[in-house]
């Protein structure tokens, strides 16, 4: 049996290794929850044996050394980390310690914030002008990232307002919204570039680029949460007051910051944020709870590595470790072949996970994945579970290579990968049963033709029994034929037939989306429908004409043009129209004749809307004569900013474009 000294040495060595991977290499090998568990184990042993604590123990310092490639900045005030709690009992114990330590009987109020999963930074302003920025590094010395921080549009280069201190060091978190993260990885997969495991790694990798021009292309954003150096000026005597003052000076502060009057209110805040977490649009891993009074903070003071007046209340882990049993290959509606890891089932964020996407061959190569490997699985919100990385230090001896198929696993057709694309595709088209199934499932889905009651299992049976080959065949189905399907009685069959009949009356935009043209989502379909007005005009459009539609570039234009150039696709459309699929004739909208504040304007929506869905908002805006675009440019007239608006809002502010919130949008929609 190992001695206590040996256990301590092994734990410290393991933690130092993972700190190096996390802080220096930006390539963590284990989940945060596993790191937290190891740290707790080390703390418990050191608490029982204080005589064995060493100055270089991971419990005695904050972080890890900065990268040598950057020059260094020494923090005038150390950037400490926070202690963690993981359950209500631990938080209530922290609350009691705070109450017991305070010498006065004054009431304690708490300032509660989101614990953003990004990169902590320090930004120094002198006379209101940004002069330097640094990472936290080891808490004493960080990396000079001034040039990169200056590219982040959410961070003001000059503060505005009155009574700005001569020297003010603002601290906060640089992070990457989920939409930006997905776009970066989507682009990387298409071009064969580096794919990031999660938004935190993407933010760190983007911020620590030696070339600021690369950082500038990444949609990073920032929220401030505290202050370091303060000279030649004053700040309010509460933490919340300071954050509100920062906001007045032009610094971004999360609108979820909340003042809680009691421990019970803190717990309610925690559970509300946990409930809202999937809809925030960016990653968090808990909430941060701080004593609001600066005077009380001073009374409480610090321990060696963290303040006594604050704590991070972390959510259940979204990452766990498990083993890959096998890798199988699925075929999508456009023929894309996606490798899927079959896992030893593991609970991640409260859900039992047994499968995880591997995206494509490049991702398997990037991960260095082999069948039998121990891997880290991540599940965030409603996102499909993903393999974050392979735990190479624990690779079994009997792992097997993952062999990507050269022929479709469903129909046997050749698999091809177009140069410049990361995705390999089955060339079988509609002769491939898998593509046929997925195309039909998309066609009847709620946001497409919206055929109520026609679920995936019905589509699977219809294809397997050869009842349906194209979307037009769906409208030829009879109740008698449907009754022959498994678990389909006469009444259910008639309901499906009725739903198909009802679905024949649709909109041009829904019809285009239902066709499943590559790269044409709902917003693009709506833009095409609004711009061309009729199917005939769209079918006849050249690639150059298609690019005149907002947010349609050369890639999307080529896919649309090629789709309508294919005779088989035109035949299916003709059959659908012959079966009675139709939509209202286009109403020619003259923006000058519409009495609407949105008429003739190019509008961009950003952030989360709480009163109506984004799709409904887009539809109403188009009805009132607006053109809804997906990105902000000099051509944009108006930006509507919901909650957690990020880089689009920052760009709009930089360009001087008018910005309104959801409340104002609803007022104008009703006017």
Swiss-Prot record:
For this protein, the record's InterPro entries field holds:
BRCT_dom, BRCT_dom_sf, DisA/LigA_HHH, DNA_ligase, DNA_ligase_AS, DNA_ligase_CS, DNAligase_adenylation, DNAligase_N
- Reactions performed catalytically: NAD(+) + (deoxyribonucleotide)n-3'-hydroxyl + 5'-phospho-(deoxyribonucleotide)m = (deoxyribonucleotide)n+m + AMP + beta-nicotinamide D-nucleotide
> Which molecular function GO terms apply here?
DNA binding; DNA ligase (NAD+) activity; metal ion binding
Enzyme nomenclature, EC number: 6.5.1.2
Kindly state which keywords UniProt assigns to this record, in alphabetical order.
DNA damage, DNA repair, DNA replication, Ligase, Magnesium, Manganese, Metal-binding, NAD, Zinc
Active site at which residues? Answer: 115 (n6-amp-lysine intermediate)
Q: Does the keyword Flavoprotein apply?
A: no
Necessary cofactors: Mg(2+); Mn(2+)
In terms of domain of life, where is this protein from?
A: Bacteria
Q: Where does NAD(+) bind?
A: 32-36, 81-82, 113, 136, 173, 290, 314
Which Pfam families does the annotation name? Answer: BRCT, DNA_ligase_aden, DNA_ligase_OB, DNA_ligase_ZBD, HHH_2, HHH_5, Nlig-Ia
Q: Which GO terms describe its cellular component?
A: cytosol
Residue span(s) of domain BRCT: 593-671
Q: Report the top EC class in one word.
A: ligase
Q: What does this protein do?
A: DNA ligase that catalyzes the formation of phosphodiester linkages between 5'-phosphoryl and 3'-hydroxyl groups in double-stranded DNA using NAD as a coenzyme and as the energy source for the reaction. It is essential for DNA replication and repair of damaged DNA.
Task: Give the HAMAP family listed for this entry.
Answer: DNA_ligase_A
Write down the PANTHER family for this protein, in alphabetical order: CHROMOSOME TRANSMISSION FIDELITY FACTOR 18 (PTHR23389), DNA LIGASE (PTHR23389:SF9)
Q: Which family does it belong to?
A: Belongs to the NAD-dependent DNA ligase family. LigA subfamily.
Protein name per the record: DNA ligase
Originating species: Escherichia fergusonii (strain ATCC 35469 / DSM 13698 / CCUG 18766 / IAM 14443 / JCM 21226 / LMG 7866 / NBRC 102419 / NCTC 12128 / CDC 0568-73)
The encoding gene: ligA
